[in-house]
Regions:
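Low-complexity, Gly/Ser/Thr/Pro-rich intrinsically disordered linker/tail segments
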Residues: 271-333
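Terminal peptide-recognition signature
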Residues: 32, 166, 237
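Intrinsically disordered, low-complexity N-terminal segments that are enriched in acidic
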Residues: 1-107
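Generic recognition of flexible, low-complexity loop/linker segments
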Residues: 19-20, 77, 155, 196, ...
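Active-site nucleophilic cysteine motif
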Residues: 159-166, 196-211
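Hydrophobic/aromatic-rich core segments of domains that either
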Residues: 202-292
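Solvent-exposed loop/turn segments at secondary-structure junctions
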Residues: 95-97, 176-177, 197-200, 225-228, ...
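Acidic low-complexity segments
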Residues: 67-69, 76, 83-190, 194
Length: 333
């Protein structure tokens, strides 16, 4: 990727959600949501190839596909549930990632070549104030966050170097740790800043909040980590500078590289991202389109799907979600 100046992949993936035995209700109205890639930033050419309910192709009136640039993009099935019936969608997309050297050595010599990138998630100029604002209850500039951001950034004025200092702090001080459901944490960022531990999403939110507190626009990006070996849930962040537009920060991957003594990998995940990503959420805690009628199992992210009957939503242990890699090919960056 470094030698080529970037990398690209074309994916074809099938997502399937099934209702487990104790939650099956034959003949009842059901809504089922599965994540889809958002067509923005690094993702292009999203195509839906198949939508199936049970053993048949779904009718057009039985599902709704959210707009391509939705904050959290899904396909929503709305139909009658039958016992044993599963819900699946097969889609393809392209992910292209440009490589830039944001290592300490490069930054000390002025950083990589500047680029002109003024457009955001929808291909139009974004209101940068939105990416600098607080978003209670989790993205808040508490006294702890303000003081921590000030201590980390110090007298540095360059936005790129400020973001690198924040990334360095998180990747060298915050240990990766599984956490209980985000729904049970009253202030995720405060939890991370005080305990110095957290999973990929906790670390991404801490990075976003510290960046915003330091005057650097930053936002959420999350979905699936899609490699030839596995498809799993993952969260990361983006930050903006006038000189380089929107770039990436994967603090959990960067922190793992740092702890293993892999300086090249540590440097890579500041400003860069591998192409094995399916971004299905570009904001944290936003409603689906169309929204659910009841409380989501995961009200913040969009990774493992959701389901609800008319009277209630289904808990995590009442349904299962599977992803299958149909094909993965390298494409010219």
């Amino acid at each position: 990727m470094k030698e080529q100046g970037g990398a690209g992949c074309r994916f074809c993936i099938r997502g399937t959600l099934g209702i487990l035995e104790g939650a099956k209700r034959d003949g009842e109205d059901i809504k089922v949501y599965l994540p889809l890639p958002i067509e923005y930033a690094q993702v292009k050419n999203v195509k839906i190839h198949s939508v199936r309910i049970g053993e048949r192709e779904a009718e057009a009136q039985e599902y709704t596909i959210a707009r391509p640039d939705a904050f959290q993009r899904t396909i929503c099935f709305h139909t009658k549930h039958r016992k044993g019936q599963k819900y699946s969608v097969e889609f393809s997309f392209e992910n292209r990632e440009a490589y830039k050297d944001f290592s300490h050595g490069s930054l000390e010599h002025g950083g990589p070549e500047r680029i002109k990138e003024r457009t955001g998630a929808n291909g139009f100029a974004e209101p940068m104030d939105a990416w600098l604002a607080q978003q209670p209850p989790h993205i808040r500039f508490t006294p702890l966050i303000r003081e921590l951001a000030s201590d980390i950034v110090g007298e540095e004025k360059d936005p790129l170097k400020k973001a690198r200092r924040i990334y360095d702090y998180i990747t060298t001080h915050v240990m990766y740790s599984f956490v209980r459901s985000y729904f049970t944490l009253t202030d995720i960022v405060q939890y991370a800043a005080s305990s110095l531990k957290g999973d990929c999403g906790v670390q991404a939110l801490l990075f976003i909040t510290l960046c915003r507190a330091a005057g650097i626009p930053a936002r959420w990006q999350a979905g699936l980590y899609t490699t030839p070996l596995e498809i799993s849930c993952h969260d990361w962040a983006q930050f903006y500078t006038a000189s380089h537009g929107w770039r990436y920060a994967d603090c959990s991957f960067g922190g793992a590289a740092f702890r293993e003594g892999e300086t090249e990998g540590w440097d890579f995940y500041f400003g860069n991202l591998d192409p094995f990503r399916l971004p299905a959420a570009r904001e944290f805690g936003y409603e689906f389109e169309p929204p659910m009628d009841h409380l989501r199992n995961d009200p913040y992210d969009n990774q493992t799907g959701e389901a609800e009957y008319r009277d209630r939503s289904l808990a995590q242990e009442e349904y299962s979600t599977e992803y299958e890699m149909i094909s993965l090919e390298d494409i010219t960056y």
